Amino acid sequence: MKQFLAICRSQAARWMAGRLAATVICLCGTRSMAASALDDLRPLVVTKTWTEHTAEKQGDTQTREVTAEIWTAAFQRRIDEAKRLEIPARPEPYYVDGPIVLPSGATIVADPAAEIRLVPGANTCIVRNANLVGFASGPVPSDSQPDTDIAIDGGIWSTTLATTPAAPQGNVRGGSGQKPPVPGVHGVILLQNVRRISVKNVTIRQSRPFGVHLANAHEFRVENITLDRHRRDGVHVNGPASDGLIRGVRGDSHDDNVALNAWDWKHYTPSYGPIERVVVEDVTGSPEGLPSANSIRLLPGVKKFDDGTLLDCPIRDITLRRITDIKEFKCYGQPNLELGRDNDSSVGVGRLENIRFEQMTFHRSGTIEVHADTDGLVIDGVALDFELPPAWHLLAIGPKSMTYKHSPTDTAKWTEIFSPDLDCTVRNVRVSGVRLAGSTEDLPTERLVNVIEQRLNPDYPRTTPSGGTGRGIWVR
């Protein structure tokens, strides 16, 4: 425990140092010695002036005029000519006003301290692969012509959410930056329709889009990702996807640290399909007291396209291991609240197959919540270093109910967040090695598993939630 607290203090100190550094806006009129590797590209660098908002301290917003260099064309020239871009560190950010586009075989290597920052109002991703292809109207075909062998290593990537969640400075979507745009893409680093790609040693800072957004991705590695005051998912994978490794995600994210979404809300995914054979390991929640979602999501479902075609989007053969202080494991569906649950929902609950949770550590309460038809769920090796509340369970099986109040007083605008009327069946569950800190005895399964049966709330909307008629079915 002492070692963990020391690590937390060290992490918090590093993040605080990064935050203080991020509040300093440097005018870019002088050339840095560190940028000499890019000197031949300087004729392509342009200087512009704009307004940015920064936060000197929480809630204290400052408006500053910034004159800085725009490096988009210069970076793109290096990629187009050499397929390798090296970005050295320098005191000021490298601003871009649109995506850096990577063809097959391209590599970006950035110093860990080099910040690549999106100008306010660009509203695009910062870097993407070349052949983005959206599949909003049907399943991904076999001949999608993916980009291959792309690598991104290092750098601080920021879309300048400089103050609060309500102040994204015009950068909210993380779009493709092309015409016509590809629907559903939403990333700071965006790799969709790709094979054999790698993203590692990067920091995602103060951004509204997903940190790393992958879709229709196979044979991928995402490693050593730091989330710094991030406002969306850290690593977000949409189906179809397979044969991936996500390792070493840490920091403070205000949405899921990692999300594997085979089905998803239509305006946040460019494609749908199974996610299989993925390892997620060494994911650490934020230190105690630092606001963060601290969650991992597995979202299966059944997609109904506009022509009525159905596509099963299961999640299978997934291993999550060495996970620390993640408080919510969200293995359930969730209708689209932004576009309306009647306009975008999975057709029934999704399917999970062969899901493994191994070597998990909780210094505070956390739960695995499952509302999906599941065959094969293993939980093995869990350390519980907190006092267990009487009603706490490690695994909850069954539907959830929660009310979202679009208006605090107009109950006609209230809506159910989840799908409390749907049953789910879970079989082949094995729970072992779950122990309190310092104990050599496993906790009994009955203490760890809760099977949920919803009831309609006769007092709704005077009290919430509305409840439902669905239940979890555990086949033992």
Residue ranges of each PLM-predicted region?
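General secretory precursor processing signal
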Residues: 11, 29-31, 427
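Bacterial N-terminal signal peptides
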Residues: 18-31
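Intrinsically disordered, low-complexity segments
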Residues: 6-8, 30, 464
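Secreted/luminal cysteine- and crosslink-motif detector
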Residues: 9, 27-29, 126
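Extracellular/periplasmic carbohydrate-active domains that bind, remodel
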Residues: 25, 34-476
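N-terminal secretory signal peptides that target proteins for export/translocation
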Residues: 1-14
